A protein has these predicted regions:
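Hydrophobic beta-strand-centered segment that forms part of the acyl-chain substrate-binding groove
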Residues: 70-101, 106
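Catalytic strand-loop segment that frames the active site of acyl-thioester-processing enzymes
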Residues: 24-54
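Active-site helix/loop of acyl-thioester processing domains in fatty-acid/polyketide metabolism
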Residues: 54-77
């Protein structure tokens, strides 16, 4: 079960960063370790004005962010995470003038790294726009502050 404090702040975390707020990221829901987010279609997010298809960079940003949120859900707390590796396979263009959705699930959590799979889609996960696999570095300082894990440092 997800910690009620985390559940309360997840919607704000979906769009707390300047870029996620500007792009309109929204939390759709959490089920188990799976997180779903949405970016409502807007003309200013289009990558190709002739087709109305959303920009590829938007897809990447959404997959990265929903992946990080899946890590928080798996850890059942908010903590600093940093993307170590993000591989995105684009399978098709997003449908013109449709919202973009993404789901992510943290499938392995170690002391220092979390591993995530994610999908971006416009209608169903069975027909993804893109799929991603990512690794995120976890804040492993145990609350001791920056540099606490450096060899020879005293906390």
């Amino acid at each position: 079960m997800i910690d009620p404090r985390l559940q309360e702040i997840l919607p704000q975390l979906a769009s707390a960063a300047a870029h996620t707020h500007a792009l309109g990221f929204q939390l759709e829901g959490v089920e188990g370790r799976r997180v779903r987010m949405r970016v409502p279609y807007r003309e200013d997010l289009v990558g190709d004005p002739e087709t109305g298809v959303l920009a590829g960079g938007l897809v990447t940003a959404l997959l990265d962010h929903v992946g990080g949120m899946a890590v928080w859900v798996a850890m059942n707390r908010f903590a600093t995470v940093a993307t170590l590796d993000l591989r995105v396979d684009y399978m098709r263009a997003a449908e013109p003038r449709k919202d973009l959705l993404a789901e992510a699930e943290c499938f392995r959590l170690t002391r220092s790294v979390a591993f995530v799979r994610a999908w971006a889609f416009d209608e169903t996960t069975a027909d993804p726009v893109a799929a991603a696999q990512a690794a995120y570095m976890l804040d492993s300082d145990g609350g001791r502050g920056p540099g606490a894990n450096l060899k020879g440092e005293e906390s």
